[in-house]
Amino acid sequence: MKKVIIIGGAGTVGEILYNHLTTDYHVLVFDKMVKNETDTHKQMDATNYDEMLEKIPEDTDVIINLLRIDTSNAIENVEAFNQMTDVFFKASYYLMLVAKQFQIAKVIYASSNHATDYYEENGYSNLAREITTKDYPFPKGLYGVLKVASEEAGFIFSLHTELSVINIRIGSVPKDEKKALLKNDRLSRTLLSKQDLVALFTAAIEADVKYGTYYGVSNNTDKPWDISNAIDELGYRPHVNTDQLKSHD
């Protein structure tokens, strides 16, 4: 059974993945927000390289990087810039250094659709076609810039080491899908359903891919992003889209 470590796993995406991946994998969650440690949930500051070296098990097979902090401005002040850089870039680099040192096979990086949000408006592509990972990444804010930077850092690790790096540009994953769909029209196109989230990350864990970048979205009507390479290269099979979720209300 593969050992899968979820870094920053205390949020919505981490909770969904932990609850479902434990059926097939030995899953551990590390997060700064863990208050009461258990055998499976540990406290760790991923911006501290030495702490990660100490706490991440050397026999890990896959690291999933879900690190996040709240951000809302396209251009941030110096304090916010430094904090965001620590979480969204430095910690990503540190994790890959740890993976290299421990000879961990794979890092799956939770990137974001904001890597290319210049091309998207309210869940619709502005390109008269679906946005692909071959489109030059034009983000509209610092958050997207740092996500792209971490994707590219993953490329140099995959190029110069044995590490496999898979970037998943996640769409929208609300805690309550049906309630969120009623309140936000954009989600009709950008939602990554819980079932598809698990299917996509499971495919990424199992895929024999050295490096790749993929959009994480369900097969929704008018979705803005192309998922054909995730289907072809990872074996992703989306099952539950927003039309189905709405029809079951």
Tell me what each language-model feature is.
Residues 94-138:
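Conserved Rossmann-fold NAD(P)-dependent oxidoreductase catalytic core, especially the SDR/UDP-sugar
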